[in-house]
């Protein structure tokens, strides 16, 4: 990503990396499956091999995580891919955040409640007795009409305004002819002219919030879509690679000041993350079951192993029993990915502009 590429001293350090300037580090993450490269780098000793002694700390939500990186309370973190761009443009807290490594690709889905799905399903084409995927948001139109007649709003959850899930959800809705609303200089809610109302919900709260009836669906990373299926509360209607194949989802972010002051530490961190990501995708995902066991622990994602394994081991369940092969639902390094791409930065920036986060002037 253009705005996320290595800058300053980090890019100039010679191939033979010197000793880390700072070796005791604290990295933050959100309880999502795609934090797994950090957990693997820690549990497999890859950080220690680089002379780094890392503490991994779960954060309450994306805003808290981002603010703690900016303040220096965290040395780096698992971040939503658009976050460094949002910081550079001042859409969120103005800061210089760089991303030397992309942690994950694909990995998100859009899930709706059972009641919404039952209405949508009436207009969804069938193939072999099962709904044909990907499912267009056009199937939401009868639901919107029903809500309108009863004087209700269709409320959908996303994880952060300048985030992967907000922009993917908006893209899907608009492609199906449903207006997700706009941000404006005088209205930061993102609901200007909206037919569906989008609001922020922390990832681990997506399922409880839908169960309570506060939202009727959401866009989030795993395992919170598969948990809705397992609990019999909802049905995923789209996975993110159907919108943007191999699109960046999470990055590892640090402040530019940290990278400039600690170039060897930054490079050694990336080396450990590359090893972890390569391990995750090696031999057609052969190591994924072990990775699932690691992140199912309460200190990491803290979800049931079977729920995490649904997506991490190459399959994805839509309606209960409708499990389909999606080997790249979670992708970390296959195809020598990991490098921040200019094209990704451009795509995310166009979404910021499209929905009003970046004004015309």
Residue ranges and their predicted role:
Residues 15-199, 209-246:
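Short, glycine-/small- and polar/acidic-enriched structural segments
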Residues 1-14:
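N-terminal export signals
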Residues 260-361:
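Secondary-structure end/capping motifs
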Residues 32, 59-63, 78, 160-163, ...:
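Soluble non-cytosolic domains of exported or imported proteins
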Residues 1-2, 40, 168-171, 209, ...:
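Alpha-helical scaffold segments in soluble metabolic enzymes
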Residues 110-111, 251-254, 258-259:
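Short glycine- and hydrophobic/aromatic-rich loop-to-beta-strand nucleating segment
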Residues 165-168, 202, 206, 224, ...:
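Internal, well-ordered alpha-helical segments in soluble enzyme and binding-protein domains
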